[in-house]
Amino acid sequence: MASEDTLSSNPLLQNFDFPPFDSVDAHHVRPGIRALLQQLEAELEQLEKAVEPSWPKLVEPLEKIIDRLSVVWGMINHLKAVKDTPELRAAIEEVQPEKVKFQLRLGQSKPIYNAFKAIRESPDWNSLSEARQRLVEAQIKEAVLSGIALEDDKREEFNKIEQELEKLSHKFSENVLDATKKFEKLITDKKEIEGLPPSALGLFAQAAVSKGHETATADTGPWLITLDAPSYLPVMQHAKNRALREEVYRAYLSRASSGDLDNTAIIDQILKLRLEKAKLLGYRNYAEVSMATKMATVEKADELLEKLRSASWDPAVQDIEDLKSFAKNQGAAEADSLTHWDITFWSERLRESKYDINEEELRPYFSLPKVMDALFGLAKTLFGIDVVPADGVAPVWNSDVRFYCVKDSSGNPTAYFYFDPYSRPSEKRDGAWMDEVFSRSRVMAQKGSSVRLPVAQMVCNQTPPVGDKPSLMTFREVETVFHEFGHALQHMLTKEDEGLVAGIRNIEWDAVELPSQFMENWCYHRDTLMSIAKHYQTGETLPENVYKKLLAARTFRAGSLSLRQLKFATVDLELHTKYMPGGAETIYEVDQRVSIKTQVIPPLPEDRFLCSFSHIFAGGYAAGYYSYKWAEVLSADAFSAFEDAGLDDIKAVKETGQRFRNTILALGGGKAPLKVFVEFRGREPSPEPLLRHNGLLAASA
């Protein structure tokens, strides 16, 4: 047991305005989390003894317990994602079961559950605000889904399943991370990497230096290729060496599918336990459990996926035909038998020839500082907010991390956020994400203020600046920053003071991508894009004809790209509805079966993409991957409100932006998302704008 002295100085246990990211270390985790859980356990017992079906005697003390745990656990989990060390990983792994045990105990508290039911059944129910009613109903539903209504022996079985699932998903993502790190290909002959742009060669040389090849340079090598996205993608897009593309593709596709890092058995066990959990709760399959907290139903999700699939199939077949004839014209020996490691490469060549756009040549026009300035400028126009640097106000975990304050039109702070832009392959996980640090809350307000302001963190994995050259971005990375900022806006601009339903909390999962995907649409809006795209050396604006090509390129291979996402969504639903663990069909056979209708080029027999499908086995998207498409329908339709108003009519754009802010961004989880959408749009969502934006409308007509 840690001594009182060491506990009193443990940063995880202090009161703080902002998390002490700079002073938390692996050795703080075990004693800190254990002491915190002990403290929260005592508070929970106290609450259960004194609970009454009222806000002050139930919701407020409960929010304090939930908040403290989510803030502290969020802090160490965040550090694991951005500053991973074996020590931190081991410490978190050790205390994770204890934290899950406490969460289960909290989620299955009969006194709390009964008090919420009493509020639900009281004569005062109708006088509660909609947000408070949503909060109560969410707590009751969550309790039922966490096994509260089960008999003792069944509840014990349920809890074992939950513990085991937590462990398995944890192990799943570690295997993916380790398998990704494990692959290294050192290249000493420049001929082998012909076609790769200087930015990629620079990255490969940096990777080589970090592995002990001190003299490596972009020009002379050696170059180290890894499976991290900033390394993998350029190889698939630009390497003329077909054998290299094949080797890297096969390695990427078979990550975590063999040896000690094989995720196959883990996936089977996860699916088996999820099905058992569903049956215990009285559902037929796990997809029904997942949909219990979503806007959609299994049937509605299936229906949407099929509608989009049938609109995408013929265009996707045409895409492959176009690629084949283009490759043939270029004299490619493989033209008639294009396969997986050729598609990205030849698509990139076709895109360059058709739209004369080379992603790499566009990079100088998208420097990170300019992109952020334009993004903040857009947020001011649409939502009337100012984003101002506040570096130094809060501790950070790396010197590259920026800190910002969001102010309303009167200049009052309304939120804060961290931004961690660059890739650090040895310690930071791939991808981009937004997470909450604090949610807006009346109950958690410091003395002297009426509400605690929300704080978010945005994390990306862009190419770091090299020398005096700023971080230069691909257009896709620009879209990613806009996307994550959309999530952050919904977290930060909430007007909801009930902490448990503020911001992104309690928003149905399939509606949560609406603001993020909505923001991506602005990257194609001429004035917005032109305010971003300034050459970092000359200041020259992106030429008009290039903008037109970018716009046209938006629908390039839309059928194929749509099918790819539909494949992920469909295989996810199949595995969580029809698949029987231990039955006649293996997970890979399910994948192959789904692919018949969703992949024009059938997958390789040895395709093991499921082994690194972290979204559904380690990331909360189980039987929920369809929600990306569901939200694309919502976001395209929301953006079409601005198109209807007139994108060049600044007054109309501001008015529509204000309406978007007052509904979709402000109401948080305090109102059902369909109601919120109808309040903004004046009607229910339609898939038509999405198909129109993707150039697939004619195909579906």
Curated annotation (Swiss-Prot):
Catalytic activity: Hydrolysis of oligopeptides, with broad specificity. Gly or Ala commonly occur as P1 or P1' residues, but more distant residues are also important, as is shown by the fact that Z-Gly-Pro-Gly-|-Gly-Pro-Ala is cleaved, but not Z-(Gly)(5)
Major location (coarse): cytoplasm
Cofactor descriptive note: Binds 1 zinc ion.
Description of how activity is regulated: Inhibited by salicylic acid.
Binding-site list for Zn(2+): 483, 487, 513
Family annotation (Gene3D superfamilies): Collagenase (Catalytic Domain) (3.40.390.10), Endopeptidase. Chain P, domain 1 (1.20.1050.40), Neurolysin, domain 3 (1.10.1370.10)
GO cellular component: apoplast; cytosol; plasma membrane
GO biological process: proteolysis
Enzyme class: hydrolase
InterPro entries linked to this entry: M3A_DCP, MetalloPept_cat_dom_sf, Neurolysin/TOP_dom2, Neurolysin/TOP_N, OpdA_N, Pept_M3A_M3B, Pept_M3A_M3B_dom
Keywords linked to the UniProt accession: Acetylation, Coiled coil, Cytoplasm, Hydrolase, Metal-binding, Metalloprotease, Protease, Zinc
Sequence positions bearing N-acetylalanine: 2
Coiled coil: 148-194
Family: Belongs to the peptidase M3 family.
Biological function: Oligopeptidase that may be involved in the degradation of proteasome-generated peptides. Binds salicylic acid.
Name used for this protein in its record: Probable cytosolic oligopeptidase A
Organism lineage string: Eukaryota, Viridiplantae, Streptophyta, Embryophyta, Tracheophyta
Gene: CYOP
